[in-house]
Design a protein with these regions (language model features):
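A glycine-rich, often tryptophan-bearing local segment used as a flexible ligand/cofactor-contacting loop or short
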Residues: 31, 35-100
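Short, basic, glycine/proline-bearing loop/turn elements
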Residues: 23-33, 156-163
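A short, well-structured beta->alpha microelement
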Residues: 1-16
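Conserved beta-strand scaffold positions in the cores of enzyme catalytic domains, especially
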Residues: 3-6, 56, 124, 141-143
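Catalytic beta-strand/loop cores that center a nucleophilic Ser/Cys/Thr
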Residues: 91-154
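Structural motif
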Residues: 21-28, 57, 141-145
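Extracellular ligand-binding/catalytic regions of CAZymes and related secreted enzymes
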Residues: 47, 148-190
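Alpha-helix C-terminal capping/helix-to-coil transition sites in glycosyltransferase folds
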Residues: 18-19, 52
Length: 190
């Protein structure tokens, strides 16, 4: 069973990550200023955790934070805004759903200006409608551009209601972590 701890910049101290297998940075508000103010003080701790064999899961903003500008966890791969890709079907940064193919199955998944991934070598688990990678694994790093962790209240706007996934995306996220990061069938995140 996974050991799950919640932390803030004030809780990370020597040994904090010693009994942790996976660090998760979910989606949410954030950009360079947020990173510098909240996470940069813990940069050495997270990098040391990864060098010791830890696993990283980044969702949306958490995926961007794996990039060279932040935690620098990727080898030859860059996280770029999907909406700026020439063939992206979503062109603005607001809450909507994106058409994705996840392990061969079509889904509409909550999207809020998430990344796609360019360059380097990685395994693609899911793609956007244009074929760009949406969810990838590179070694011990798992990144997801959309929001499989989304909750029912994220779909409260009239145009979003038909796309609520009834927790199916939570199961997909749990399976992603179990299969690709923890290599275990015993992962229950929700």
């Amino acid at each position: 069973m996974a050991n799950i701890k919640l932390f803030t910049r004030h809780k990370v101290c020597d040994g904090f990550f010693d009994d942790v297998d996976l660090v998760v940075f979910p989606g949410g508000d954030g950009e360079a200023t947020t990173f510098k103010g909240i996470l940069k003080p813990n940069l050495p701790d997270v990098q040391c955790f990864m060098q010791r064999g830890g696993k990283y899961l980044g969702i949306c903003m958490g995926a961007y934070w794996a990039d060279a500008y932040y935690f620098n966890l990727l080898k030859g791969t860059r996280c770029v805004q999907y909406i700026k890709r020439p063939s992206a079907e979503i062109r603005s940064s607001y809450g909507t759903t994106a058409q994705v193919t996840w392990r061969g199955q079509e889904h509409r998944m909550y999207f809020y200006d998430g990344p796609t991934y360019l360059g380097g070598q990685f395994d693609t688990v899911a793609t956007y409608a244009n074929g760009d990678p949406m969810a990838i694994i590179q070694g011990s790093v798992g990144l997801i551009g959309c929001h499989p962790e989304s909750q029912a209240n994220w779909y409260s706007k009239k145009y979003m209601l038909p796309h609520w996934h009834e927790n199916r995306h939570h199961l997909m996220l749990s399976q992603f972590v179990a299969d690709y990061l923890l290599h275990s069938r015993q992962m229950h995140l929700f």
